[in-house]
Structures are given as structure tokens and as C-alpha cells.
Amino acid sequence: MAISRLLVEKFRNLTAVDLDFDPCFNFLIGNNGSGKTSLLEAIFYLGHGRSFKSAVTNRIISYDEPHFTLFGQIQESQHQWSVGLQKLRQGNTLVKINGEDGNKISDLAHLLPMQLITPEGLTLLNGGPSYRRAFLDWGLFHHQTSFYSAWSNLNRLLKQRNAALAQNQPYSAIKIWDVELAKLAHQVSQWRAEYAEALRPEIEQTCQLFLPELEINVSFHQGWEKNADYYEILQQNFERDRALNYTFSGPQKADFRFKAQGLPVEDVLSRGQLKLLMCVLRLAQGEHLMKEKQRHCIFLIDDFASELDQYKRALLAERLQQSGSQVFVTAITQRQLKEMQVENKKMFSVHNGIINALN
């Protein structure tokens, strides 16, 4: 999977962009604030329908413009697609695939599996459980065809139940939802547990390469007592849930936990080690997708050199090259990319929102 061409209009400070990319490595060189992270953000938005920088659409659309537009040409093996996304200031999103309307963001996400590595991405490890649930759910979205529908229905039922709890409804009014909610909760949790277990040896093996000085242990917690019947828990805890106005236990509390030397990694590891572990997780997940589904991720790496010494940068560069994935990397200077000794690459300079190819 690779983006061969990208057009960007009215997105942040970027001047109208029309770029052809290398299917392997693409380097974006420029000072802070030049627009190189904005280009990564545009690529990410094309594959997710949202930004990794801001939840406020009006901050992303160029000043005094009604919308921004993204268009990409995608190649995978012998197949090619054109994808387009337009976001209006009023909030509406228009999605086209091969020129046809009526597509959803989830259709774009399926076409464009992406892994994002940024300085802010450490929330995967030191943030709340929701970041790690999202990590697992991303994998299941691409591995398990029935997951997205089940996950969407599960979230819908949880919202309905929480609304009923907030309205102080009796259990007789909620019981009918609990039957289906429990069924979906067990299914989603089983998928998460199986995916976490499949990923665990790949994570631990990659950790031995990047963090040989540490023993990293990985575990999945489903969000309620192991081996307990979730339907019974919903019944038993109804009064507590009603007092809280929300459902306390369940798959919405699941977590994918990482420990080093028996302690949570955020309490033990340095920022540099946390960044390496984040890279390990993204690499392992991308490589697992390739192994199981024969699909490559697109890797977006912002500020490649930060927090990593020369040896670790060389290790990461080598592993990315071995993955066969398309990679986009930002850096302030070309010197920061000297460990990226790759043959197939394109170099771009970014200055005040203007992007030019250097080779």
C-alpha cells in the first residue's frame, strides 16, 4: 500500500500541494513551523477523517476558506484507487473513492492503514487506557471483518444504557439492552484478547532488539473480572451504575498494559525508552498486518531524530526498510537523516508552506 500522488488544497498553511511520492521513503526537510508536520497531518486525515493535532476543524481549514480538499492516488500490487476527502467549515465531510460518492470514513481507513509516530504519541504508553484500546481496535478493524460493526453497536448500546441510567430509569427498562450488550461485550473482548495474544510475541521479540536492557511484559485486561459473566455483572451492579450515571465495568474499561521490571513502563522508562517502546508497538503491529493479511502500513514519523541516539535511529531505519512499507519522515536538517541510508527515496524541502522536490 502506497500513496503515489497527493493533492492538498486549503489545509493549514500549506500552499496548494501536488506531489508524487516514492513507494518506499519520503523525507520532508524544513524548520519548525514550515509545514512539514502539516503535510503528515494531511496524509493522516486522508486515511482517518480526523487530525492527530486538533479536533477543531476550523483550525485546520486555511484562513477565510470554506473547506479543505485532499486527493490521493493509491497503489497496492496491481490495483489502483483514487480517494478524495473534503471537509467543510460547517462540519460536513464528503468522501469519494474512485470518483463515487456515498463512501464512509471507515472505507478510507480500510484502504489506508497507517502507523503514526510523533513526539506526542507517548500517550499510547503514559496516557489513559483509551489510547491502548484504540491501538488494539485499530488492529482488529484491519484483521477481523466483523469487528467494526460489533464495536459500533457496542458503543451505541453503552450510550443508550448510560443515558437511561442518568434518567434514573428502572432496571426493567434497561434489561433488554443488557442482554445484547453482554453478548457484544464478550465477543469484542474475546477478539481483543486473541489479538493481544497474537501480537505479544512480536512485541517482545522486537523489544529485545530495541530495548535489550529491559524485560517488557504485556498483558490484556478486559474491563471486568476474568471469567465472570458480564450480563450478571450488569445486573448485580445496576444500583451502583445508576448512582454513578454510567456503566462502571465493561469493555469500555479494557486495557493493554506494559510493565518493565514488574512496574508500569511510564514509571520506569525514560522518555527515550518510551519512544523506543512506542516505535516497537507500531512496528510490531504493522509487521503483523503484513504477515497475516499481506498488506503494508504507511508509516508517518514526525521529528525522527528526537529522543533517539544515533544507534537507535539506525536500528529504526533498518527495521522500516525491511518492512517494505512506504515511510514519510520529517526532520529539520538532512544531517538528522544520515542513518536513513536507503536507495529508494525522495527528498522534499518545506518552507513557509511551500513544498519542493529536491531529487
UniProtKB/Swiss-Prot annotation:
Q: What GO cellular component entries does it have?
A: cytoplasm
Q: Which UniProt keywords apply?
A: ATP-binding, Cytoplasm, DNA damage, DNA repair, DNA replication, DNA-binding, Nucleotide-binding, SOS response
Q: Which InterPro entries match?
A: DNA-binding_RecF (IPR001238), DNA-binding_RecF_CS (IPR018078), P-loop_NTPase (IPR027417), RecF/RecN/SMC_N (IPR003395), RecF_2 (IPR042174)
UniProt signal peptide: none
Summarize where ATP binds, as residue positions: 30-37
Superkingdom of this entry's organism?
A: Bacteria
Under Gene Ontology molecular function, one entry of this record is: single-stranded DNA binding
Query: What residue ranges are annotated as transmembrane?
Result: none
Question: What GO terms in the biological process aspect are recorded for it?
Answer: DNA replication; DNA synthesis involved in DNA repair; double-strand break repair; SOS response
UniProt-annotated location(s):
Cytoplasm
Its biological purpose:
The RecF protein is involved in DNA metabolism; it is required for DNA replication and normal SOS inducibility. RecF binds preferentially to single-stranded, linear DNA. It also seems to bind ATP.
Family affiliation: Belongs to the RecF family.
Check the record and name the NCBIfam families matching this protein: recf
> Which HAMAP family does the UniProt entry name for this protein?
RecF (MF_00365)
What this protein is called in its record is DNA replication and repair protein RecF
Gene assigned in the entry: recF
